[in-house]
């Protein structure tokens, strides 16, 4: 197993938990982004910089991931592609995406995009994502510990 991190938007707290888990379990963690992210020197931590552009990091992760690998992302279409390749998906808020819940998440995402596109939902009507807090950190740490042993 390897841990693939969609690193463009991973919170610093989650990044630190991924690093600690990778080192504790001797699991390779590959951080993928379109700009370098500072990582401490370790043979278990890899920073992969992809060219700038729409979904370049996502495409790279999907291309490289193997069945049984874990991806850390909150990107629902990326999560779907990873699941199609036999990977596992954990969000930084501790939600595990699987074949039983990903289609519902995709449908809801598409529905909300349609509502925004037609003007039914104004940007100010959407609550957006809450700040990353202690509850999120604990849920993520618990999920990570369960999936990476």
Swiss-Prot record:
This is UPF0178 protein Psyc_0274. Belongs to the UPF0178 family. It comes from Psychrobacter arcticus (strain DSM 17307 / VKM B-2377 / 273-4). The lineage of its organism: Bacteria, Pseudomonadati, Pseudomonadota, Gammaproteobacteria, Moraxellales. It comes from the Bacteria. InterPro entries: UPF0178 (IPR003791). NCBIfam families: PRK00124.1 (NF001095). Pfam families: DUF188 (PF02639).
């Amino acid at each position: 197993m390897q841990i693939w991190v969609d690193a463009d938007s991973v919170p610093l707290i989650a990044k630190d938990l991924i690093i600690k888990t990778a080192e504790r379990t001797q699991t390779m963690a590959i951080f993928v982004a379109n700009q370098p992210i500072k990582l401490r020197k370790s043979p278990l931590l890899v920073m992969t910089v992809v060219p700038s552009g729409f979904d370049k990091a996502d495409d790279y992760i999907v291309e490289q991931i193997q069945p049984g690998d874990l991806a850390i992302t909150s990107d629902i279409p990326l999560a779907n592609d990873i699941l199609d390749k036999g990977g596992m998906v954990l969000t930084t808020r501790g939600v595990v995406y699987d074949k039983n819940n990903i289609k519902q998440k995709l449908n809801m995402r598409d529905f909300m995009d349609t509502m925004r596109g037609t003007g039914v939902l104004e940007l100010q009507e959407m609550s957006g994502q809450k700040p990353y807090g202690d509850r999120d950190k604990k849920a993520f740490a618990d999920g990570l510990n369960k999936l990476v042993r």
